[in-house]
Structures are given as C-alpha cells and as structure tokens.
C-alpha cells in the first residue's frame, strides 16, 4: 500500500473517531441536543469500517493509527475548540508520528 495513501486513510479514520467522540461530549458536557448521538454513531461506524481498509493485521493497524490519532486530535483542538497546542503537545505528537512510522515502515518477516 502506498505510504501516502495509508497516511491519508489514517487521517480520515482519526477524523471519524474524533467526530464520533466529540458529538457525545457536546451533549454530555455542553448541554447540546441528544440528537447528536445519531451522527456520532454513524461516524464511529465509519471509523470502524475505515480501519478494515488497511491491509495489515488489525492490531498493527490500530497501533500505528494511534500516532496519527494524537496528531489529528491536536489539530482538532486548535481548529474546532480554539485552543492552540503547546510546544509539548507538538513534541508529543511528533514522537507519536515517529512511532507510527516505525511500525508502518519496519521490516516484516
């Protein structure tokens, strides 16, 4: 699988998960409509489906995906929630992305 394609798929997967978790947060913590649970469930279903599109084992896919998820969550924090990530947030995301790259690019038997 093309590395750029895989990374893009990880990003889409992370966005689907963040949306699926953020909408219930809005309902539970900010008093928004419980109807937000409907698109949240749909988003989480898309998230699970996107994970199946990766060609490697589920556990390895999910482990590598974690690094991208961290970076996407920080972008979400900045763009949607209006809170700029700290230097330490960015360093942590970089370490996570490096970990993801090691998992994805590492040699296989």
Curated annotation (Swiss-Prot):
Does the entry feature the keyword Cell membrane, yes or no? Answer: yes
The UniProt entry's GO CC annotations, sorted and at most eight, read: plasma membrane
Q: What UniProt keywords are attached to this protein's entry?
A: Cell inner membrane, Cell membrane, Membrane, Transmembrane, Transmembrane helix
- One Pfam family, short name: UPF0060
Subcellular localization, per the record?
Answer: Cell inner membrane
Chain ranges passing through the membrane: 3-23, 33-53, 62-82, 87-107
Origin superkingdom = Bacteria
What the entry lists under InterPro entries is as follows:
UPF0060
The membrane topology term of the UniProt record is: Multi-pass membrane protein
Principal place of residence? membrane
Query: Its family?
Result: Belongs to the UPF0060 family.
Name assigned to this protein: UPF0060 membrane protein MXAN_4406
